[in-house]
Amino acid sequence: MTGIQLAGIRVGPIIGVAADPNYVAAGAPLGMIATDPDDPTDPWSAAAPPGGVIVQTPGPTAGPSATGTLRIPVPKNVPAGPRRVAIQAGHWKSDEVPDELRRLIPQTGAEWEGVTEVEINLDIAQRVGVILNSKGIAVDILPTTIPVGYVADAFVALHADSDGVGVNSGFKMAHGARRGPYEDALLNDIKDSFGGATGLNYDPTHISRNMTGYFSFNWSRFQHAVAAHTPAVILEMGYVSNDDDRALMLDHADLLANSIASGITKFLDETPRSKIFGQDLVVPAFPSRPSPRP
């Protein structure tokens, strides 16, 4: 059996990974990707995630631009019992990050007219947690620092943006690349629920590399990241710099929290754990550089 194709990610059967001659142990280098344009002295080098990977090089008939693939084993610590979800409150405890995330320390989030992004993020994250708990779902409210190789049935990072002038309005979402095949479903379920409940317009124009390359998604750059199998998305709930968006996030936090929880539960109902963690992932090698923002 050579695997199947799901949403652009090839999925294959579990094998004895440690015995494979191309196995790279957790934390071992996978080679340099590029240099950071903001700091050329700090090369962006990929490292194998917890559980390691198998490096599959291009075959003899591959074209000159082929880069091979990385085979990521199913995590050994897949949750048992109730479904488990992580809600990350963006920028919360950013001053407590480990050394590999040291560049995130000064990034404390947006602020406008005395209202901070982190207080909005944490408040709504906690409300989402209470709602999910009431449905029998186990919830981890996470700060900036993600547990090493974090594994759950879903991960949602909550943020609020600012344009610095108070013009932009709306919400936006993204997920990373070189991850599992179920992130589009998680994103769309939350997007539909959140947009329908809040009336906010979706703002795809301002989805940035900081979102698609969000550090928590980037298992090849950071050990403190979400495991590749775990469906993970980032939600920018609105613009703290916009009077209407800010009022919505402050005065109608329960509305936002319920809509986020509704999207998550829809995803969980339609995506059993056995599908998420049923097989190894095979993803393209050499991930893109991650974002430096929390």
Predicted regions and their residues:
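Active-site histidine-acidic residue metal-binding/catalytic motifs
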Residues: A46-F155, A160-S162, S169-F171
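Solvent-exposed loop/turn segments at secondary-structure junctions
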Residues: H91-S94, E117, T145-G149, A160-V165, ...
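Catalytic cores of processing enzymes, dominated by hydrolases/peptidases
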Residues: A154, P181, A185-I234
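Surface-exposed patches in mature extracellular/periplasmic domains of secreted proteins
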Residues: K135-P147, T198-R209, T271-D280
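N-terminal secretory targeting signals
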Residues: M1-N77, G278-P294
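Sec-exported extracytoplasmic/periplasmic mature domains
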Residues: Q126-I137, A160, K191-G199, D254, ...
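Soluble non-cytosolic domains of exported or imported proteins
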Residues: E111, V115-D123, G180-A185, A247-N258
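Active-site-adjacent mobile loop/cap segments within catalytic or ligand-binding domains
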Residues: D161-V167, A174-H175, S208-P294
